[in-house]
Regions:
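Primarily recognizes the serine-hydrolase "nucleophile elbow" in alpha/beta-hydrolase
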Residues: 109-156
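Short, proline-enriched alpha-helix->beta-strand connector loops that line the catalytic pocket
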Residues: 109, 155-160, 186-189
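Alpha/beta-hydrolase-fold catalytic nucleophile elbow
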Residues: 56-57, 114, 138-141, 163, ...
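C-terminal catalytic histidine-bearing segment of alpha/beta-hydrolase fold enzymes
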Residues: 177-221
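Short beta-strand/loop motif that positions the catalytic acidic residue
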Residues: 162-164, 168
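Conserved alpha/beta-hydrolase "acid-adjacent" motif
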Residues: 169-175
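Serine-hydrolase catalytic machinery in alpha/beta-hydrolase-like enzymes
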Residues: 2-110
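Short N-terminal helix/helix-N-cap motif within the alpha/beta-hydrolase-1
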Residues: 34-35, 148, 203
Length: 221
């Protein structure tokens, strides 16, 4: 069984060259690895110069491609199977978040999660079940797994920004609205940004919104 000691991946910053005062974990999607999102870090670092960025490779080899990693399998996309996969990976990610926090001597309020696709699903599932609220979550092109369970399992309520393209051919655009409704129903503050014509990707406007959101969350922390 993988554990948080098995997770590694590229890192960036702090841009200031000083001791990290904030931490952002970037969680990639299915079939990618940590190198997929670490390229976002320099853009975010312009607004967050004292922030360290870590982009771990997901714990499991991708079973739908000859390369890449996955947080959980999507060969069977039934809600029950997806939930079981998320629940299996959740303790690994949860322990990794805590280990990275402790390594830098930070508190939960000093860290944020940024996810893409599967990384968004994992971010939302894990962060909202941690006993202490992190500073915030940015979720690109993702979904909320098991929304019917959230209200009964939520332990903390960090603010969330969801960004999704309305031409997404992988994760339906409607997933953003469904996630927002469930999050709001559980008392979580949610901002949403729809990107016209954008497929399963992240664009400049989405990056800019993420920078503004995390700057606000981490500065207020």
């Amino acid at each position: 069984m993988a554990n948080f000691f098995d997770l590694d991946g590229p890192s960036f910053g702090p841009k200031s060259g000083g001791k990290p005062r904030r931490l952002v974990l970037l969680l990639h999607g299915l079939g990618a690895d940590g190198n997929d999102l670490i390229g976002l870090a320099p853009y975010f670092a312009e607004a967050l110069p004292d922030c360290a960025f870590v982009s771990p490779h997901a714990p499991f080899p991708c079973d739908m491609a000859p390369y890449g990693r996955q947080w959980f399998s999507l060969q069977d996309r039934s809600p029950e199977t997806v939930l079981a996969g998320v629940q299996a990976a959740a303790p690994i990610l949860d322990a990794y978040i805590s280990a990275q926090r402790d390594r830098l001597g930070l508190a939960d309020r000093d860290l944020a999660l940024l996810g893409f696709s599967q990384g968004t699903m994992m971010s939302l599932y894990v962060a909202l079940r941690r006993p202490q609220a992190i500073a915030g979550i940015v979720g690109y092109s993702g979904a909320l797994v098991a929304p019917h369970l959230l209200a009964g399992e939520v332990k903390s309520k960090p603010p969330v920004l969801l960004v999704h393209g309305d031409a997404d051919q992988i994760v339906p655009f409607q997933a953003m609205g469904a996630a927002a409704r469930a999050l709001q129903g559980a008392g979580v503050a949610v901002d949403t940004l729809a990107r016209p014509g954008l497929p399963h990707s992240i664009d400049e406007e989405g990056i800019a919104a993420g920078i503004e959101f995390l700057s606000r969350c981490l500065t207020a922390a």
